[in-house]
Amino acid sequence: MPLVTLGANIAQALKKNEVIPDATGSTYTLILTDPDAPSRTDKSYSEYLHHIVTGLKLKAINSGSADSDQFSAADVAASFATPIDFSSGHELVPYMGPGPPPKTGLHRYIYILFKETKPSLTKFDGDRPRFGTNKPGHGVRAFAAEHGLIPVAVNFYYAQNEHQ
């Protein structure tokens, strides 16, 4: 299977085989944010920053034999089981788990993986509410634009306080 860079045009003949994104040499930032802080109707702390890790690298997959462009199913499965090498990263903002206040309903906790286009950040001086600004609703979008981060993957989950 040939490797493909994100956003590339792919010939019809190549689309018949499984395609794997090429991330060789790239670094990434992972951010966890809560856009519903303190609640979906009160955005006074939104967005609330829960975690930032910079300088992450993706684990390479075994490219098969030197004279083959084929990958074994085991190589592909192993590469996607733990694709991020967390040992390569720098924890810019320590992890803070979910903690929605009582009677605020469901909160979305969103993980976003960004490709870094500039050198990795090494310092964050802001507070967690509003990503360190005094602007309600300020969060990951403005932070990413300011620091040259391009979103490449996202996932989220819901959590709520047990005392509703």
What residue spans do the PLM features occupy?
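N-terminus-centered regions that define maturation/targeting leaders and the start
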Residues: 1-164
